[in-house]
Design a protein with these regions (language model features):
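Non-catalytic terminal extensions that flank enzyme cores
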Residues: 1-20, 38, 43, 141, ...
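N-terminal Rossmann-like or analogous alpha/beta NTP/dinucleotide-binding catalytic cores
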Residues: 2-125, 206-225, 277
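Proline- and acidic/polar-enriched loop/turn elements at helix boundaries
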Residues: 48, 79, 116-117, 230-233, ...
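Short, Lys/Arg-enriched charge-dense amphipathic segments
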Residues: 64-74, 97-113, 131-145, 249-266
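A short, terminal or domain-edge coil/loop segment
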Residues: 68, 99-109, 163-170, 280-291
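Short, surface-exposed acidic
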Residues: 74-77, 225-231, 265, 278-284
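Low-complexity, flexible helical/coil segments
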Residues: 79-85, 146, 222-227, 239-240, ...
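Active-site cores that bind ATP or allylic diphosphates and position pyrophosphate for catalysis
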Residues: 112-246, 253-258
């Protein structure tokens, strides 16, 4: 339930240009926009493009095509693909990410890990293979992981509840710098949210562990402002009842549906059917009823 007295400065829509956006993304964007307009928050468009080997110009353009098709507004950020490339790519904020990584190194909060994905297959959480090996931080082809413990954290929700929680086991010693030397999602996301002054973060239930990891990282970095932010985690749209939608599911992409002649109103209506809403959805403002 949305606190009707809530007021925020800024929220964000943060797609990744690694595939065509689908109806699950549309739901997240629409909810973000609905909450923003209800609470007076500006909407920042932030394109998360640090996974460079997966970035495709077609997917970047699809972000703008999808937002415009669905009439999802944004107040800040790139207006088109060229503006994004010239002024808003995360690559232009690398100094900010490097400063945070250097702080973690100076505080001795990170360790070097050379484990490959295949070596970690079958483990539900990081087994600590490299935790005590004291490998130099400048070892080539390695990642940096954060030393984590069992400390408590508090999460503020959209209805003003405070949840006391701990880092999920699956996020133990999570990665903050990848083997390609780019910052990992958890670090880049918190740095960006602090940099842009985002105080309301809307994301799917599947990213709840990431929220806890980011609150943990904020505590390590001494970023108390991040710990004051409000979070809303929304239900996911599921395929076949138990699998979340993915960008590889072409038939649910907005691009595909648009090509089949569906209108924006039809896409919203389809989302409403999947969620079995009492009232039909026709535009992003209608998603306020889902809160």
């Amino acid at each position: 339930m949305l606190n009707t007295a809530a007021n925020f400065t800024r929220t964000r829509i943060a797609p990744t240009p690694s595939g065509y956006l689908h109806v699950g993304n549309a739901l997240s964007f629409a909810l973000t926009a609905a909450i923003a307009r209800k609470t007076g928050a500006k909407i920042l468009l932030r394109i998360d493009d640090l996974d460079q080997h997966r970035v495709n110009p077609e997917y970047v353009q699809d972000i703008f095509d999808t937002l415009n098709f669905l009439a999802i507004p944004w107040d800040e950020g790139p207006r088109d693909a060229e503006d994004y490339k010239q002024n808003w790519s995360q690559l232009q904020r690398m100094d900010l990410y490097q400063d945070a990584l250097q702080q973690l190194a100076d505080q001795r909060e990170v360790f070097t890990c050379r484990c490959s994905r295949s070596q970690l297959q079958g483990f539900s959480s990081y087994p600590g293979t490299c935790r005590n090996r004291s490998l130099p931080l400048d070892t080539p082809d390695t990642a940096w992981r954060l030393y984590t413990d069992d400390r408590e954290m508090q999460l503020k929700t959209l209805n003003d509840a405070i949840i006391t929680t701990r880092l999920p086991e699956a996020m133990k010693d999570f990665v903050v710098k990848k083997k390609d030397n780019y910052p990992a999602y958890q670090l880049a996301s918190i740095v960006d949210d602090l940099h842009f002054g985002v105080d309301l973060i809307v994301r799917g239930d599947d990213l709840y562990p990431s929220t806890i990891a980011q609150l943990y990282l904020a505590d390590v970095l001494g970023e108390d402002d991040f710990k004051k932010k409000t979070f809303y985690h929304h239900p996911l749209l599921m395929e076949d009842g138990d699998r979340k939608l993915s960008k590889s599911a072409g038939s649910t992409s907005i691009k595909y549906l648009r090509g089949q002649g569906m209108t924006a109103e039809s896409v919203y209506a389809e989302i409403g059917k999947i969620l079995t809403t009492k009232l039909p959805l026709q535009r992003f403002q209608d998603c306020e009823a889902l809160l």
